[in-house]
Regions:
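Substrate-positioning beta->alpha
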Residues: 41-76
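Amphipathic terminal alpha-helices
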Residues: 120-130
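Alpha-helical elements of Rossmann-like donor-binding domains used by nucleotide-donor carbohydrate transfer enzymes
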Residues: 25-29, 54, 66-73, 82, ...
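Active-site "gating" loop of Rossmann-like NAD(P)-dependent oxidoreductase/epimerase domains
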Residues: 1-16
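Residue-level signal for the nucleotide or nucleotide-sugar donor/cofactor binding architecture
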Residues: 61-62, 88, 120
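Active-site Tyr-X1-5-Lys
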Residues: 14-42
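Short glycine-/acidic-enriched loop or helix-start segments at secondary-structure transitions
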Residues: 1-4, 48-49, 92-94
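Mid/C-terminal beta-alpha module of Rossmann-like enzyme folds, strongest
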Residues: 70, 74-117
Length: 130
C-alpha cells in the first residue's frame, strides 16, 4: 500500500497498521451483505486545520462539505467506491484555501517505509455524482 498510488476499488488491500486492519475488517463484514455500499473516503475538515502539511504524500483529499453535497447521489449504488478529490499532495490541497501553510515531509518524520502514494482512482465516484 502506498507504493504505486491511483488505487482502484478492486486492487488488493494490504493494511499496514491496526487502524487499517480495523477498517478492512469492517469492509469484510459489510461485504457479507450483498445490498451494501462501502465508501473509501478521503476527506478532511474545512478549513484545513493544520499549520503544516505533507509535501511528499499524494492523496485525494476533499473537504467534508463537498462529500455532504454528493452523498445522496450514491445511496442506491452497491459495492465499493473510492471517494475523494483530485489527486494532489496534501500541501497543495491545503494551500488552495490557506497560502500560509508550511511544508513538512512525511518521509523525514515517519521514515522511508511510510506510504507516500496513497491516491485512489475516483472514476466510479465521478460518474456517480454527475
Amino acid at each position: 500500500p502506498g507504493i504505486k498510488g491511483n488505487y482502484k476499488e478492486k486492487d488488493p488491500v494490504l493494511p499496514i497498521n491496526k487502524y487499517a486492519v480495523s477498517k478492512f475488517g469492517g469492509e469484510c463484514s459489510v461485504q457479507m451483505y450483498s445490498n451494501s455500499l462501502i465508501l473509501r473516503i478521503c476527506m478532511t475538515e474545512k478549513p484545513f486545520i493544520h499549520k503544516k502539511a505533507f509535501n511528499d504524500v499524494e492523496t485525494n483529499f476533499m473537504f467534508h462539505d463537498t462529500l455532504a453535497k454528493n452523498l445522496l447521489k450514491l445511496i442506491d449504488i452497491k459495492g465499493i467506491i473510492n471517494v475523494g478529490g483530485k489527486k494532489n499532495t496534501i500541501l497543495n490541497f491545503a494551500k488552495k484555501n490557506n497560502k500560509d501553510i508550511d511544508k513538512i515531509s512525511a518521509k523525514k518524520i515517519f521514515g522511508k517505509n511510510y506510504p507516500l502514494k496513497q491516491s485512489m482512482r475516483i472514476d466510479l465516484y465521478k460518474k456517480a455524482i454527475k
